[in-house]
Structure formats: structure tokens, C-alpha cells
């Protein structure tokens, strides 16, 4: 693979609303940082492969090798100030929802688990890791990753297992997620830092999270 041009990618979004307080703890780089990294890489022949960085909505002509605009670097301080003054005050859509009851989730869980388990089988994935999702009334949804049936348990049941993933999020958002992707989606909620994870051991399992994205109607 010998491209004439390459473009680095970096997530340029910021957290708004209540979760904006987590922005400083989020692993992130600016597009400028990614471009500088590749521009200074000794493994790239910069005479043959040229890095390209563009403003939003600008155009790059592959024939001439030029953009229609001069790139303007991100002003990090201005970006932080705008997020603090404006974005942090935004409300999430789900914050206007009525707080759901335990019964609201009990109606959804069987079908959601069915989809989760189908994806787990498709991935040919089985694990001793137990997934616990926090529910109203101090209950937890226990989802085994090995094909066993799901259960509604109390929080103290977590202590019975050595390998687990505990998931906590706003019940209103959780109800939207489990109601289906047209309302909200696990992956988007995770990227936006709306979900808290507690793992034992502290190991990220891609297969668990892939299957988890199908825990919805």
C-alpha cells in the first residue's frame, strides 16, 4: 500500500452537559497532534507519501495536491472555554424523560437478552465473565457470557464472582438503549462517557462489548 497522500484521523468531539466534567480525563488527541505524529515519523518516506490536514468543509484536489483553503490549527484554549461556557450547560434528550420503574425493564429484558445471546453465539464467544447492569430498586440484571440464563439479582450477588463487568448509567438512558437503536445505542452512550464500567479483573474484552451492543429490542 503506497498512497500518494494520507489523512490522519482523530476524534474531535468534546463532552457537553453534565458529563463535560469528564472531558479532562478522556483519552484524546487533536487532529493537529495526529498530523504532527505522522509528519515526524521516521518510518514514512515523506517525499513519496504526503500528509494532508484539512479544515472542516474544505476540499483537497488529488490531481494538484492542493487544498482550497489554508489549514487553521485548532485553538485549544478557545475550544476549552467554549465547552466550559456553553456546552457544559446543555441538557441531554433523555433528561426530560420520566424515571422508569423496574417493571419497565422487566418487560424488555427477555427479548434484549435473546438478541445478546444470538450475537454471542455468532461470535463463537463464551466466557466466565458475568455482566451486571444496574437497575432500579437496587436490583441488577445478571447476564452470563457462557449461554446460561439471565437473572434479576441484588447488588450483593456480585461478590460471588471473580470475573465481572458492572455497568451503571442513568435509568432513563438505559431504557432508551434497551428499547432499540432508534432511541439510543450502547456504542454511542459509551463513547459519550454516559456509561460507567467496573471490571474485575481490569481487562477490556472486545467480544463482551460487541455482544453487549445487541442488548436491545
Segments from the language model and where they lie:
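Binuclear metal-ion centers of metallo-dependent hydrolases, dominated by the metallo-beta-lactamase
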Residues: 1-82
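Feature captures hydrophobic
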Residues: 60-217
